[in-house]
């Protein structure tokens, strides 16, 4: 018998709003509250909010916290010197495969926070503890299931958060992208997101999230589900763990080589040896379909250099055409013509540099 689905502190709010709920990584999460298309456009044109409380915040502290994270992840946290600053990274296995992608926040040399994906949270914690024990790091790893998280995204997102919580504006208005600030005790506001739009991700005590959700709703922020979250992140050129990459995929094969810091040769992060010895046999590209149809994951892609495969695909609400990501042979370049097999028919597609949409506007590809 399968385990019951986990629920976030906002579960009753979703049900009361008529959300269609689905199993997402073992969590009962809203797919949509009505029109997925309208939710998508709300984020691109105004403001939408997502319950992301299924994601796990993990506090990492102790005398060796910085050294531990420099060993644990492929990006180099040593570049973070300003409290509240964050970076995106992959956590790799010894073979160079991606255990998870995550965001790491710096507060002090002995005080960090790591945000991991919901479906990999237990695996991630076990791996972090294993690395800490293997190398004898003096570090405390504390999962924070007492916290909830809401992402408010869109061109008007920040203004509507401030309308709902005026006291937060002074601390959060100066934030640069990929930075966070404590706006009150136990509450962190970060200028981050997963949509390609401006906005905040707000981490706060679980017992305070329902009132925040209701207050944002009163300011006209539209609740959005996983369906819109997926089309938004695809347009923005952002990977989804478990779909675009996993433990068998190296960062280079998922368009994430920019998250691997190799400059400091003395920093032997987990997976570095495999990364340095591995010749990348696949490239990761965006595709835009040139005729009618919808690309989906696992569809074959025919290129002049050989065969590839879609990892993600959807109909783009902003562009009105199907877009997707594909792993293809090395040598495939933006501007190349390829074909995607859809229902037994080979349909032409254009290879594009990501993203497809930036700040609500289509990115020109030729």
Curated annotation (Swiss-Prot):
Name the SUPFAM superfamilies on file: Aminomethyltransferase beta-barrel domain, Folate-binding domain
EC numbers on record: 2.1.2.10
Task: Describe the reaction catalysed, as an equation.
Answer: N(6)-[(R)-S(8)-aminomethyldihydrolipoyl]-L-lysyl-[protein] + (6S)-5,6,7,8-tetrahydrofolate = N(6)-[(R)-dihydrolipoyl]-L-lysyl-[protein] + (6R)-5,10-methylene-5,6,7,8-tetrahydrofolate + NH4(+)
GO cellular component, alphabetical, reads:
cytosol; glycine cleavage complex
Spell out the Pfam families in the cross-references.
Answer: GCV_T, GCV_T_C
Enzyme kind, highest EC tier? transferase
Is Oxidoreductase found in the keyword set? no
Q: Which domain of life is it from?
A: Bacteria
- List, in alphabetical order, the Gene Ontology terms for molecular function in this entry: aminomethyltransferase activity; transaminase activity
What the entry lists under InterPro entries is as follows: GCS_T, GCS_T_bac, GCST_C, GCV_T_N, GcvT/YgfZ/DmdA, GcvT/YgfZ_C, TrmE/GcvT_dom1
GO biological process terms held by the UniProt record: glycine decarboxylation via glycine cleavage system
For this UniProt record, give its keywords in alphabetical order, as a comma-separated list. Answer: Aminotransferase, Transferase
> Partners and quaternary state?
The glycine cleavage system is composed of four proteins: P, T, L and H.
Query: What does the protein in this record do?
Result: The glycine cleavage system catalyzes the degradation of glycine.
What NCBIfam families does the database record attribute to this sequence? Answer: gcvT, PRK00389.1
Family membership noted in the UniProt record: Belongs to the GcvT family.
Instruction: Tell me what this protein is called.
Output: Aminomethyltransferase
Underlying gene: gcvT
